[in-house]
């Protein structure tokens, strides 16, 4: 595997920003499908792929989500062409016969409901990270948010399912509106150890 060039690394990481302001031009469904097609290949435990992606694009759906968000997140949701609810499906073990066929009993690994939920939350968070990097790879900006009422979002969007919300992320073409100066990051020695 070859190292990516500096321009690509800049687009994905070092020059990318979390956006608050958005060009409201809609994103074609084909772009949303292409983004999922990239995201789904990111690794998860036992290939379980517990994340579920609800693409909120209509004015009606945006209003439903915005009213359940905190502070300034509502206007961001209304302005962005798409905000994605990244959830995790507690029924994910039922898909393991398809996704992990070489281990026929894999779904029985998740009989403990607490362990199952932790696995789903952890791996949907991984998938959410892949999703944001995938969006940047396709030339989109992202704006992740966790300021919303999870229980209310679950009731509003996931009623009748075993899906729970993890976080939300707006995607599209960002503007400089509300873009803060880049904040510092922890240095290697503050965040890492080589053992």
Curated annotation (Swiss-Prot):
Its EC number is 1.-.-.-. Keywords: Flavoprotein, FMN, NAD, NADP, Oxidoreductase. CDD domains: RutE-like. Pfam families: Nitroreductase (PF00881). The keyword Ribosomal protein does not apply. InterPro entries: Nitroreductase, Nitroreductase-like, Nitroreductase_HadB/RutE, RutE-like. The keyword Oxidoreductase applies. GO terms for molecular function: oxidoreductase activity. Its cofactor is FMN. It is an enzyme of class 1 (oxidoreductase). It comes from the Bacteria. Belongs to the nitroreductase family. HadB/RutE subfamily. This is Putative NADH dehydrogenase/NAD(P)H nitroreductase CCNA_00059. It comes from Caulobacter vibrioides (strain NA1000 / CB15N).
């Amino acid at each position: 595997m070859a190292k990516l060039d500096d321009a690509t690394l800049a687009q994905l990481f070092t020059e990318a920003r979390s956006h608050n302001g958005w060009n409201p031009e809609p994103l074609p469904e084909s772009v949303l499908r292409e983004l999922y097609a990239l995201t789904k290949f990111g690794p998860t435990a036992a290939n379980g792929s517990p994340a579920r992606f609800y693409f909120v694009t209509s004015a009606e759906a945006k209003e439903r989500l915005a009213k359940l968000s905190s502070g300034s997140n509502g206007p961001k949701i209304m302005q962005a062409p798409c905000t994605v609810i990244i959830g995790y499906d507690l029924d994910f073990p039922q898909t393991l016969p398809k996704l992990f066929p070489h281990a026929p009993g894999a779904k029985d690994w998740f009989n403990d409901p607490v362990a199952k939920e932790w696995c789903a939350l952890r791996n949907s968070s991984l998938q959410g990270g892949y999703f944001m990097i995938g969006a940047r790879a396709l030339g989109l900006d992202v704006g992740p948010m966790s300021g919303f009422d999870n229980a209310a979002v679950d009731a509003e969007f996931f009623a009748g399912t075993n899906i729970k919300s993890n976080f939300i992320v707006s995607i599209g073409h960002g503007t400089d509106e509300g873009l803060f100066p880049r904040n510092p990051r922890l240095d290697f020695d503050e965040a890492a150890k080589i053992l």
